[in-house]
């Protein structure tokens, strides 16, 4: 008999947003059962529970839109931490399982690709930094471990190595193209040159002490990360924020989205195709928004906009300034988008380039723009409303062609949506306080937010003193970088920068 999500939950005693313990041998089969009945794989993380239970634990998180999050947790023996791989049937798990081996030494048996992920060649074998007995300031020895890149052989096939250092002002990443003529046959990326050790560095810190680390996971996504983290900490401590704080969080989330999308629209059309008019106008409009951010919260990238238990307040003058800048941005954006959409040379570069099919987007667990431009209406604001989104009219923006043009259109439409949501939030802003103190307590919980790149999910566990025992972060870029294996091949080499900019991913957000 085919199991439904309801029957699975009933069988396991699993409640919404709950965690259920399963055996190591059940984890893969139950995970597949959830996916086959409509759940989406979202996140995997591990915890070192040797001190309390003598085990490591692997957690697999799933989402059912408008229903809840489900976590399956499998305890593994400390002397042999292994389990049957999920990747064999759920492709979206493949990077997480490689990452958990690098971090904890946990083996996903049967995984098809056992190369390193986070660790580069100079990290000695047996280095697992998220184990509790590994100190953050451990000095590593010298090593030169192999990291073989895939090779494509055939007549006329050659390789083009790009990076990790690039000509533009971007972060480091290496890409290896296998090419015949100008046509890309295969594309593989090697990232993780920007490792900061955030999840390790926050261990033992208070939630407030950890917040600045979280805000800096990805420089342009301070609100998205801070919001997911704050919601996790607040759930873990049973802290209930005020209605005003929840509505303020909508404002900050949408202002960050608007500024990022304005930048990406200019970057895609300008630096991606040479249509420099769009770059100049997009970057000029971005500067107006950055100056507004600094005027409102004292930081151009909105650090401090989200606080634990609340949000930075907005007075009447600040609200009026936001409305003025939104009106100007809306008017100017409409003008430049009209020019962009009526420029045949630009749209011809966008259309049919970098196509990601709906099936591939679903299989890889795509998030954000990448998912919605390929026909998947995935958006945490609608699927799992947080902050005050449940009280605002909202439907995800979806396109279906899956190409660069679709990703451009989704961003353009989401700019208009962000402007309208911000206006609605300011109009509905309740009176009252903007923050409450955290309740100091031991606990654990998930938190999430829909950043401009996609869904951020955090797991937070606090110890008996209310300090961070484990922070696990799922950044949307981590899920979306593997998409290049799908959108790169079949295109010509000069279109790769355009494909890259159309996804607009973060190197730093991927490499915590």
Question: What are the roles of these predicted feature ranges?
Answer:
Residues 78-91, 218, 397-411:
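Short histidine-centered catalytic/ligand-binding loop motif
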Residues 81, 94-102, 227, 256, ...:
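Short alpha-helical basic/polar micro-motif
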Residues 158, 162-267, 271, 294, ...:
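Active-site- and interface-proximal helix/loop "cap" or "latch" segments in soluble metabolic
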Residues 218-342:
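Internal, well-ordered alpha/beta segment that forms a basic, Gly-enriched binding/recognition surface
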Residues 398-490:
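Substrate-recognition/cap regions that form aromatic- and gly/pro-loop-enriched pockets
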């Amino acid at each position: 008999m085919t199991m439904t999500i309801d029957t699975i939950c009933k069988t396991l005693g699993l409640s919404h947003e709950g965690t259920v313990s399963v055996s190591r041998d059940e984890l893969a089969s139950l995970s597949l059962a959830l996916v086959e009945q409509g759940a989406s794989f979202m996140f995997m993380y591990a915890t070192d529970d040797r001190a309390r239970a003598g085990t490591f634990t692997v957690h697999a998180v799933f989402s059912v839109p408008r229903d809840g999050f489900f976590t399956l947790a499998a305890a593994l023996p400390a002397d042999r931490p292994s389990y049957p791989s999920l990747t064999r049937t759920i492709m979206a798990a493949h990077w997480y399982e490689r990452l958990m081996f690098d971090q904890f030494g946990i083996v996903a048996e049967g995984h098809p690709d056992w190369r390193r992920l986070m660790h580069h060649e100079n990290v000695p074998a047996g280095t697992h930094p998220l184990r509790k007995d590994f100190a953050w300031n451990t000095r590593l020895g010298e090593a030169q471990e192999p990291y073989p890149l895939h090779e494509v052989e055939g007549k006329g096939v050659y390789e083009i190595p790009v990076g990790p250092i690039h000509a533009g002002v971007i972060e480091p990443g290496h890409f290896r193209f296998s090419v015949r003529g100008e046509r890309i046959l295969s594309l593989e990326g090697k990232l993780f040159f920007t490792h900061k050790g955030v999840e390790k560095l926050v261990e033992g810190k208070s939630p407030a002490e950890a917040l600045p680390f979280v805000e800096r996971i990805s420089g342009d996504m301070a609100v998205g990360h801070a919001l997911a983290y704050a919601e996790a900490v607040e759930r873990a401590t049973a802290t209930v924020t005020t209605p005003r704080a929840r509505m303020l969080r909508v404002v900050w989330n949408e202002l960050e989205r608007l500024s990022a999308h304005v930048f990406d629209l200019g970057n895609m059309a300008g630096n991606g195709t040479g249509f420099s008019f769009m770059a100049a106008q997009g970057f000029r409009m971005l500067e107006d928004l950055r100056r507004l951010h600094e005027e409102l919260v004292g930081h151009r990238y909105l650090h401090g906009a989200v606080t634990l238990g609340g949000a930075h307040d907005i007075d009447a003058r600040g609200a009026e300034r936001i409305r003025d800048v939104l009106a100007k941005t809306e008017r100017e954006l409409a003008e430049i988008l009209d020019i962009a959409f009526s420029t045949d040379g630009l749209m011809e570069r966008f259309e049919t380039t970098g196509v990601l099919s709906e099936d591939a987007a679903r299989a890889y667990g795509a998030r954000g723009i990448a998912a919605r431009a390929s026909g998947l209406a995935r958006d945490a604001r609608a699927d799992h409303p947080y902050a005050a989104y449940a009280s605002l009219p909202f439907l995800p923006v979806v396109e279906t062609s899956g190409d660069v043009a679709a990703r451009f259109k989704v961003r353009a439409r989401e700019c208009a949506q962000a402007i309208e949501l911000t206006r609605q939030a300011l109009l509905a802003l309740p009176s009252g306080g903007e923050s409450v103190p955290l309740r100091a307590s031991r606990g654990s919980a998930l938190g999430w937010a829909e950043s401009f790149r996609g869904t951020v999910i955090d797991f937070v566990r606090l110890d008996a003193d209310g300090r961070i025992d484990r922070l696990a972060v799922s950044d949307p870029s981590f899920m979306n970088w593997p998409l290049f294996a799908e959108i790169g091949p079949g295109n010509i080499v000069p279109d790769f920068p355009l494909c890259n900019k159309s996804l607009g991913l973060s190197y730093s957000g991927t490499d915590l």
